[in-house]
Amino acid sequence: WLAHFAADVAAAAREVGFDGFHLDQYGYPKAAVRPDGEIVDVAASFDTLIRGVREAVPDATLVFNNVNDFPTWSSPSAPQDAVYIEPWEPVTTYEALARVATRARLVGGGKPVVLAAYQSIYDKAARDVGDASTRLTMATLFSHGATQLLAGEDGHLLVDPYYVRNMPAEDETLDMLASWYDFLVANDEILVDPGIVD
């Protein structure tokens, strides 16, 4: 299966021109048993997957989605370009986001840490409330050495894990995001330097 999948990924890179890949997973089950009763180490199987794809596309950008922080304790050592985490319950507070970001930096081997902390608040509340929540989320992540996957194409925001379900941002929100991203770039030596730890 892995050889077939890796060959398909390499073909996509070669024939379609993709220069990067996001390897996804469901997050569950975290344990598996084969029909013959053999227990499968799911975390180790993801490591094998990442390594197999990296061999097939050595020059592509490659990230693996650690859904709900699984298996962040092992996957960052695999040959990928960032530690990417999609947090779900019980990661529902800024404190919990900070813990996830800090832990990812500790095991990340100097790789950038990116969290897909979707701002679904924009679906439920006025823009100013969504912007306030986004500022708090970005402050939490930036101050713990991580960034947030939020800004999409054509001024849209990712508000849901199903990326095609995104939301156009108002001009005020885009201006706010630009100022925060400018701040991150201007201060990256102290915010996301992998050598700085809590």
Task: Describe each model-derived feature in a short phrase.
Residues 1-112:
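Active-site neighborhood of glycoside hydrolase catalytic domains
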Residues 49-50, 57, 64, 74-80, ...:
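Active-site-proximal substrate-binding groove within the catalytic cores of carbohydrate-active enzymes
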